[in-house]
Amino acid sequence: MRELLISVKAQGHINDLLLSEPKLVKKIFSLIADIQKHPFGGIGKPEALKHDFAGSWSRRITDEHRLVYDVTDEKIMIIRCKDHYDDK
């Protein structure tokens, strides 16, 4: 099984959502569990990203929020889990 890492940014997003939308945090953890089993398929409509985010993947949390992550042979890095990846 790949090592799971969560970036400081994603940890901050989870903390923010715990206060504003706690039900989303449960969905985020469900997505993360599924990513560990099926990094490139599964729930949340996995999508390989392009352009500035090439090499990363996203899954839908809601219409507004996306979970963005990287996958290697050794690890899964959760990059962000709030807002849409086009929001810079």
Model-derived regions: residue spans:
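Enriched for short, Lys/Arg-rich terminal
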Residues: E3, Q11-S30, I43, K50, ...
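Residue-level signal for threonine
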Residues: S7
